Curated annotation (Swiss-Prot):
Annotated tissue distribution: Expressed in seedlings.
Family: Belongs to the cytochrome P450 family.
InterPro entries the UniProt entry points to: Cyt_P450, Cyt_P450_CS, Cyt_P450_E_grp-I, Cyt_P450_sf
Any one Gene Ontology molecular-function term assigned to this protein's record: L-phenylalanine N-monooxygenase activity
E.C. code: 1.14.14.40
Keywords recorded for this protein, A-Z: Glycoprotein, Heme, Iron, Metal-binding, Monooxygenase, Oxidoreductase, Signal
Annotated residues for binding of heme: 472
Protein name: Phenylalanine N-monooxygenase CYP79D16
Glycosylation sites: 500
Reaction equation(s) it catalyzes: L-phenylalanine + 2 reduced [NADPH--hemoprotein reductase] + 2 O2 = (E)-phenylacetaldehyde oxime + 2 oxidized [NADPH--hemoprotein reductase] + CO2 + 3 H2O + 2 H(+)
């Protein structure tokens, strides 16, 4: 058996090498012709020390031997003392960047040049063949869907229209945590990862479907096992969108699923769409039955009711399904990750809790809960969330940008087709930008003049919500969700390490940037009992 496997592997390798050699030499001739003029004046970004690209495959062998890839890349950049690098994976120049000046040039000055996305089997499957928005290459489909998102779903008017749904879920979150403090066990130990992730999922599902759960909720208001599996599948898709699969750089490997990513994505899609698609299909039938006269109550109604110039549905059923899935993915991870990390850090620095509660009590008092109208006055609370975005980003890199033409960035030549990745870790923890970059210090974000703190970072010293032509169009929603989640948890409860633990272990997971262990913390109500029942 082992001999057969070895023989098949050898045959595959020989076939692959022959295919790649022909493609490589053909592409090299084209690249040499197109790039010759610019390359005479500007070099490629530096190759990290110790890396020498192999013919055809580049540094793919090193990538495959050094997992997780994002930690390998950041280690190479640190050892080479560079804020921009060029790592060739097969015939693709991968360019990680951790300098805010270069990042601003990419996302602001040259955002039109870097306005497309890389192709991968994961993004193809998740977007139903590139018919959505965030992960879709630049083109007419992207323009169409982005217009729908910005003008119909995320406009200021629509944001206000959906306020009650967001507040309902914030109220539900507080009741759920309160129930954990008063359950039969009486322990008050709360799984904050579960609470924060499901709050975010519940908010976006309420906005899209006008419902919290696809299955029955538990007696304490929490999610069922089926609901937890659904949300876990959403997070698994986020983990594998741009996971440095070999097939992302050598297209002929797609379908072989050598690293198992394709199966994981397909399984996640099957699970999530098992819950989402029947709701969407039933709603479409309802609209058809009412002849397009249904009064909209959520974003799904809006998507279905859109018409083109001839009065026909603007979006196909697949476009609606794909966009709904993408909106859910876009909403769940950033706020929940920031809140979990911030509370973990603050448990180890209790004086930060005290300062945040003083602000909350001064603005909100103790006879009601935090409302969205309060958020603009909660500068220290927002500084705590902002610091979590800086120090503990949800992903190591921003969504990759692909250069649509040869260009230069910071006196470096960036060939057409390069994958440019802004490092959230490298920017937010850059010692050339931040004092004590590895310390959680919310006060660094407070302004001397007392002006309002915002979660966005226009100078790209860190990335909370991306900017530019392919930037995050939901930063207002993301800010509301993040600050409301965090403020409700801080205002309603005190938080401590569980009994027999003096501190929270802040170790990162090896393969991602979440806490290595989900945050379990001891919660105690700090408001009058009647406030929790609203």
């Amino acid at each position: 058996m082992e001999a057969n496997v070895g023989f098949l592997t050898l045959c595959l390798a020989i076939t692959l090498v022959r295919f790649l050699m022909k493609r490589y030499w053909h592409q090299s001739k084209i690249n040499d012709k197109n790039n010759k003029a610019i390359k005479q004046h500007y070099p490629l970004p530096p190759t990290p020390k110790g890396l020498r690209p192999w013919p055809i495959v580049g540094n793919l062998p090193e990538m495959l031997m050094n997992k997780p890839t994002f930690r390998w890349i950041h280690k190479l950049m640190e050892e080479s003392n560079t804020q921009i690098a060029c790592i060739r994976l097969a015939n693709v120049h991968v360019t990680p960047v951790s300098c805010p000046i270069l990042s601003r040039e990419i996302l602001k000055k040259q955002d039109a040049t870097f306005a497309t996305r890389p192709l991968s089997i994961s993004t193809f499957l998740i977007t139903k063949g590139y018919i959505t928005t965030v992960m879709v290459p630049f083109g007419e489909q992207w323009k169409k869907m982005r217009k729908v998102i910005t003008s119909e779903l995320l406009s200021p008017m629509r944001h206000k229209w959906l306020t009650d749904k967001r507040i309902e879920e914030a109220d539900h979150l507080v009741r759920y945590v309160f129930n954990q403090c008063n359950n039969d066990e009486g322990s008050g130990i709360v799984d904050l990862r579960l609470a924060t992730q499901h709050y975010c999922a519940n908010v976006i599902k309420r906005m899209i479907f006008n419902q919290r759960y696809f299955t029955e909720e538990m007696k304490d208001g929490g999610p069922s096992v089926e609901e937890q599996n659904y949300v876990n599948a959403v997070f698994d898709m986020l983990r594998y969108i741009y996971a440095f699969s070999a097939s992302d750089y050598i297209s002929c490997l797609r379908g072989l699923d050598l690293d198992g990513h394709e199966k994981i994505i397909k399984d996640c899609i099957k699970l999530t769409r098992k819950r989402q698609d029947p709701v969407i299909e039933e709603r479409i039938r309802e609209h058809q039955k009412l002849g397009g006269n249904k009064v909209p109550v959520d974003l799904l109604d809006i998507l279905i009711s859109l018409k083109d110039a001839s009065g026909q549905p603007l979006l196909s059923t697949d476009e609606i399904k794909g966009q709904v899935n993408e909106m859910i993915m876009a909403a769940v991870d950033n706020p929940s990750n920031a809140a979990e990390w911030a509370i973990a850090e603050m448990i180890n620095q209790p004086h930060l809790f005290e300062k945040a509660r003083q602000e909350l009590d001064a603005v909100v008092g103790k006879e009601r809960q935090v409302q969205e109208s309060d958020l603009s006055q909660l500068n220290f609370v927002k500084a705590c969330a902002r610091e979590a975005f800086r120090l503990h980003p949800v992903a190591p890199f921003n969504v990759p940008h692909v250069s649509m033409a040869d260009t230069t960035v910071g006196d470096y030549f960036i060939p057409k087709g390069s994958h440019v990745m802004l490092s959230r870790i490298g920017l937010g923890r850059n010692p050339k930008i931040w004092d004590e970059p590895l310390k959680y210090k919310p006060e660094r974000h407070l302004k001397d003049d007392g002006s309002g703190v915002v979660l966005t970072e226009s100078e790209l010293r860190f990335i909370s919500f991306s900017t530019g032509m392919r930037g995050c169009v939901a930063s207002t929603l993301g800010t509301s969700m993040t600050v409301m989640l965090f403020a409700r948890l801080l205002h309603g409860f005190t938080w401590e390490a569980p009994p027999n633990e003096s501190r929270i272990d802040l170790t990162e997971a090896d393969g991602e940037l979440l806490l290595a262990k989900p945050l379990f913390a001891l919660a105690k109500p700090r408001l009058p009992a009647h406030v929790y029942q609203t």
